């Protein structure tokens, strides 16, 4: 029964992300600890969000701004390597603390959000978004401010954001596989 409920929640949060363009992953990772063990939280979240974002990127492929992907990808590879090494030293019992702190700061701290906006490079955005996703799971807001600044068209922002999040989640899933 938990699997059915989690599937419905995943569908609903993915729908929110599809309509609004962001937020579904953060909602999902806040709910998931009620249904799955902590050691599976980040990898399962990565798999669900990988499929959600990848399908959104495929459906909106004509709006994806491919010129940002190489810089983001390079930063992502470096970030995932460094943060994967750090992950070996973090106890799983702290993962909910990191996730909760990140969500609260993202939603309620103007100062935190201002600091995030300083990373005005797709390389740095890839580094931090993909690296931090190993620990907190839902890091989509890190690139959305940059995309919103560079592209005023909502379809371009949503499709490109989905492509970048697909990269993040694919790399995260590969790291957790090994």
Positions of predicted regions on the chain:
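Small-residue-enriched transmembrane helix starts and helix-helix packing motifs
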Residues: 1-16, 117-131
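Membrane helix-loop-helix hairpins that form the core translocation module of multi-pass transporters
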Residues: 39-110
